[in-house]
Amino acid sequence: LVRAATLVRITERVLAPAHAAQAWERALQASVFGQEALEISDMRLPSPLTPLLDETHAYASRFLTQGRPWVEALLDLACHIQSEFIYDPEATQVDTTLAEMLAMRRGVCQDFAHLMLSCLRSYKLPARYVSGYLFNAPLPGVPKLVGSDASHAWVESWLPGLGWVGFDPTNGKLADHEFITIGWGRDYSDIAPLRGVVLGGGDHELDVRVTVSRMDETGLAAYASPQTQLDETA
């Protein structure tokens, strides 16, 4: 049994119109020849779980048209993955390949993130796999995001002058203040939320539950108090 509680402070980042209007080709050029090219070069290459397939290159070509704004193109790609693939927790396993998922047209957040990564990397655009959590207690009348009751996965791509910007192909939206980043890597194999070895007979089943709640200033003060910290370590 593994339990963890974490206090996270998140500041929402707003995309300036000048950044959002950049053509995707400019992002590609900067990722190859810019100052950060070496630092992000490994995120332009295929990885064990995100091979470069003809199918993913063809899929991405629908959105990465000549001169199209970078944010618009990538958000459109994420939205179409959300609408054209079915979220089905029973459809895939950790070892399901990207080609198998494409044939089924269904999967989970991990699969959709791998699909978007392969699409972007097939055009040599730098993109990384992000693992984290979603805020799963929205305001009244606002539906929960898909994947908010367990660990979640989405994609970040690099934009010149701004850095890494997140896109969620499971929910078809930009990753905003509701997304809590735990780590990132080339694909799921780099950043699995929990690793370990279980010894014993019989069948084993993994059960994951996540709760994310807003905390006001009073709650923050109580959480940070010496007495609270003492109680947690007792």
What feature does the model see in each segment?
Residues 1-12:
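Short, hydrophobic/aromatic-enriched beta-strand segments in well-ordered soluble domains
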Residues 4-6, 77, 155, 208-210:
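A structural signal for short, well-ordered beta-strand segments
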Residues 12, 24-107, 115, 186-188, ...:
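Secondary-structure boundary elements
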Residues 16-20, 24:
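N-terminal low-complexity, intrinsically disordered segments
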Residues 58-61, 79, 111-202:
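Hydrophobic/aromatic-rich core segments of domains that either
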Residues 191-234:
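Short hairpin/turn module used for nucleic-acid contact or packing/dimerization
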